[in-house]
């Protein structure tokens, strides 16, 4: 892993998980929230089943009223507030989905709430928060990431006496998220099947901890696979370190899972179940590719975190006929992001490349580039050039979309043989990051 860590192991980590969550706790929560939210579908996916050789089922949490599983933990927490706590109000921090769940709870209970979200939260999610909360919710946009927004929410709760509903590191929240697993097992049982693997997206770890807790009691032979964004793999960092630590930086693209530090309780639950939990990472480019595939093939609008389970699926091999459940955790994606999503996917698949090309300042050079260097099915998607009459050459920024990823080597060979000087911009360089 390339992240730099700041060691912050909490001395109370193990103590916080001393009273681990049992299946009975989750079943009680399921009964508590079942009058408000209906079970989400568990759908067989022919395309992914054919690609993997396994039986792939999608748990459609993107079809919740708030388009995310987060309503489960928020509702389980809010339903247990005393009248005194309701009168004092609710505070929450979220990258967007938990906020919508809390907003839904505030409106349904008639409780005032203040919700803190980081500045990179998509406008679509901000708007949906207000739709669900209406006049019962005020939105506070602050901080460059979830952790900074969370710090502001904690300060608010301490100052005002409002109840803070945690997005992932609280017992009632984790128990609520665990009802996803209870539904999965019930739905599979009704089909006469049992799960061999459950693929779980991971940010702060609340969903993973809830699923692991339920499966440990009710389906101990089921393997749980947690998938984190490669740019925010905080659970893997915690397991490697022996306790939760804070990543110095995270890539905010997978906004629903861009968490610098996993929850202490969630870490404890996962650590105690390492024999049945496997952790892995998915690159942001792989996530984008799966988002597009889900939309184009199944008509599913998944947010980046919602596609993590599918991105992880593609990196694994399964015994033929294995039953694998992928949790599509959310569908709150801003349509304005799809241009960036498509770009990242093309780069990930090796179809999009950028070059700095030094054209001699004389007629016919661009025609030469197009005819002799570019492949017959390749396309120029970006061309920025400013002619300078007082120079022998002029530099152009050129983006090329290849018809096949395998065509890169021959393109580079033609560039090498050409009299026109060119340089490929490598991923990870400042120029490249600026473009993508």
Curated annotation (Swiss-Prot):
GO terms for molecular function: L-serine ammonia-lyase activity; pyridoxal phosphate binding; threonine deaminase activity. InterPro entries: IlvA, Ser/Thr_Dehydratase, Ser/Thr_deHydtase_PyrdxlP-BS, TD_ACT-like, TD_ACT-like_sf, TrpB-like_PALP, TrpB-like_PALP_sf. Coiled coil: none annotated. The modification N6-(pyridoxal phosphate)lysine is found at residue 70. It is an enzyme of class 4 (lyase). GO terms for biological process: isoleucine biosynthetic process; L-serine catabolic process; threonine catabolic process; threonine metabolic process. Residues 358-436 are annotated as: Regulatory. Gene3D superfamilies: 3.40.50.1100, Biosynthetic Threonine Deaminase, Domain 3. Residues 1-357 are annotated as: Catalytic. Residues 353-427 form the ACT-like domain. Keywords: Allosteric enzyme, Amino-acid biosynthesis, Branched-chain amino acid biosynthesis, Isoleucine biosynthesis, Lyase, Pyridoxal phosphate. It holds the Pfam family Thr_dehydrat_C. It catalyses: L-threonine = 2-oxobutanoate + NH4(+). Pyridoxal 5'-phosphate binds at residues 97, 203-207, 329. Pathway: Amino-acid biosynthesis; L-isoleucine biosynthesis; 2-oxobutanoate from L-threonine: step 1/1. Its EC number is 4.3.1.19. Transmembrane segments: none annotated. Its cofactor is pyridoxal 5'-phosphate. PANTHER family: THREONINE DEHYDRATASE, MITOCHONDRIAL, THREONINE DEHYDRATASE, MITOCHONDRIAL-RELATED. Homotetramer. Catalyzes the anaerobic formation of alpha-ketobutyrate and ammonia from threonine in a two-step reaction. The first step involved a dehydration of threonine and a production of enamine intermediates (aminocrotonate), which tautomerizes to its imine form (iminobutyrate). Both intermediates are unstable and short-lived. The second step is the nonenzymatic hydrolysis of the enamine/imine intermediates to form 2-ketobutyrate and free ammonia. In the low water environment of the cell, the second step is accelerated by RidA. Belongs to the serine/threonine dehydratase family. This is L-threonine dehydratase biosynthetic IlvA. It comes from Corynebacterium glutamicum (strain ATCC 13032 / DSM 20300 / JCM 1318 / BCRC 11384 / CCUG 27702 / LMG 3730 / NBRC 12168 / NCIMB 10025 / NRRL B-2784 / 534).
């Amino acid at each position: 892993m390339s992240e730099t860590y700041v060691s912050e192991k909490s001395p109370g980590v193990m103590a916080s998980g001393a009273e681990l969550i049992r299946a009975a706790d989750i079943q009680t929560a399921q009964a508590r929230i079942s009058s408000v939210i209906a079970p989400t579908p568990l759908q067989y996916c022919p395309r992914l089943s054919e690609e993997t050789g396994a039986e792939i089922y999608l748990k459609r949490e993107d079809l919740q009223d708030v388009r995310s599983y987060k309503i489960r933990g928020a509702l389980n927490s809010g339903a247990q507030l005393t009248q005194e706590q309701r009168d004092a109000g609710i505070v929450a921090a979220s990258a967007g989905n938990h906020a919508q769940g809390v907003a839904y709870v505030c409106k349904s209970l008639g409780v005032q709430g203040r919700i803190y979200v980081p500045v990179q939260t998509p406008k679509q999610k901000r708007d949906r928060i207000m739709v669900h909360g209406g006049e019962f919710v005020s939105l506070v946009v602050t901080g460059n990431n979830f952790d900074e927004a969370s710090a502001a929410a904690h300060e608010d709760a301490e100052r005002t006496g409002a109840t803070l509903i945690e997005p992932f590191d609280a017992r009632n929240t984790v128990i609520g998220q665990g009802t996803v697993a209870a539904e999965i097992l019930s739905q599979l049982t009704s089909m006469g099947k049992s799960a061999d693997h459950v693929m779980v997206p991971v940010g702060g770890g609340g969903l993973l901890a809830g699923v692991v807790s339920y499966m440990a009691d009710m389906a101990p032979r089921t393997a749980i696979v947690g998938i984190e964004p490669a740019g925010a793999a905080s659970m893997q960092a915690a397991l490697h370190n022996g306790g939760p630590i804070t990543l110095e930086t995270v890539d905010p693209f997978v906004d629903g899972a861009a968490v610098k530090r996993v929850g202490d309780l969630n870490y404890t639950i996962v650590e105690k179940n390492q024999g049945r939990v496997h952790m892995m990472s998915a690159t942001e480019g792989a996530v984008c590719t799966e988002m597009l595939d889900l939309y184009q093939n199944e008509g599913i609008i998944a947010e980046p975190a919602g596609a993590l389970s599918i991105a992880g699926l593609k990196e694994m091999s399964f015994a033929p006929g294995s039953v694998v459940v992928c949790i599509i955790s959310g569908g709150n994606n801003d349509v304005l992001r799809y241009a960036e999503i498509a770009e990242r996917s093309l780069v990930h698949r090796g179809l999009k490349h950028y070059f700095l090309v030094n054209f001699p300042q004389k007629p016919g050079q661009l025609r030469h580039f197009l005819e002799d260097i570019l492949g017959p099915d390749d396309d120029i998607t970006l061309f920025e050039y400013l002619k300078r009459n007082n120079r022998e050459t002029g530099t152009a920024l050129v983006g090329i979309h290849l018809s096949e990823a395998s065509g890169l080597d021959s393109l580079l060979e033609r560039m090498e043989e050409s009299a026109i000087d060119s340089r490929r911009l490598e991923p990870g360089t400042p120029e490249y990051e600026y473009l993508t």
